[in-house]
């Protein structure tokens, strides 16, 4: 059996919703750490975090509806959606376009997460 590894990168980070946006902002010196605005932090010691931005007004924001219907999103943990999108990006980035079921079956993705429900 011949073994082949085709690599691609997929990222959903506090800097952007793909590798290109994240890398460009990183090189620019931007930080993904910002004040937490999505919930009340008055009783918490930490007031800042690196969160995934979903605001339409923000450059490079993650737009989950572009990947999965809202009804389907409610059925899975948010971290699973982020992992699936990053995996899809990685396969696309690799340039691997399997044309038959045999090649599709041989396709795999390795996912890493610093924290979350993966």
Please provide the spans of the model-predicted regions.
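Conserved "HGTGT" condensation-loop signature of ketosynthase/thiolase-family condensing enzymes
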Residues: 1-118
